[in-house]
Amino acid sequence: MSIVTKSIVNADAEARYLSPGELDRIKSFAASGERRLRIAQILTDNRERIVREAGQQLFQKRPDIVSPGGNAYGEEMTATCLRDLDYYLRLVTYGVVAGDATPIEEIGLVGVKEMYNSLGTPVAAVAEGVRSAKSVATGLLSGDDAAEAGSYFDYVIAALQ
């Protein structure tokens, strides 16, 4: 839940106006909006590169998944793996824009481990792929921007472990 929504819900539950502290937090959140949008734009503009390079890193670290019998063996299954990495990158951009992990959780992580397990997909490899995407993506950002985006990648990785 975003800082704005959380503040409003809390104030309303107590039938009161927003406190000066809540208003200051909302002001800070609003002031960081341009930065969060810039980060999301960089990730969006570089999504093909991020996914491609993350896939290359994953397949180097885990050659078993692209070998015969592996979950990403063959052109179609490799494309499916890369599609999933793209999906998680997209979720990260949602979190960055929202300034909160709620959209990541609500849109894309509920039941994901169970789904991968039921399909026989090695969840550890998916987490490793997201780690690789984080490495590539944060390499395109500097300092605080990399830390901001990195925290949402970490959220996805933790959900997969």
From Swiss-Prot:
Contains one covalently linked phycocyanobilin chromophore. GO terms for cellular component: cyanelle thylakoid membrane; phycobilisome. Light-harvesting photosynthetic bile pigment-protein from the phycobiliprotein complex. Allophycocyanin has a maximum absorption at approximately 650 nanometers. It comes from the Eukaryota. This is Allophycocyanin alpha chain. Belongs to the phycobiliprotein family. GO terms for biological process: photosynthesis. InterPro entries: Globin-like_sf, Phycobilisome_asu/bsu, Phycobilisome_asu/bsu_sf. Heterodimer of an alpha and a beta chain. Its main location: plastid. The gene is apcA. It holds the Pfam family Phycobilisome. Keywords: Antenna complex, Bile pigment, Chromophore, Cyanelle, Electron transport, Membrane, Methylation, Photosynthesis, Phycobilisome, Plastid, Thylakoid, Transport. It comes from Cyanophora paradoxa. The keyword Mitochondrion does not apply. (2R,3E)-phycocyanobilin binds at residue 81. The lineage of its organism: Eukaryota, Glaucocystophyceae, Cyanophoraceae, Cyanophora. The modification N4-methylasparagine is found at residue 71. The keyword Membrane applies. It is found in: Plastid, Cyanelle thylakoid membrane. It is a peripheral membrane protein.
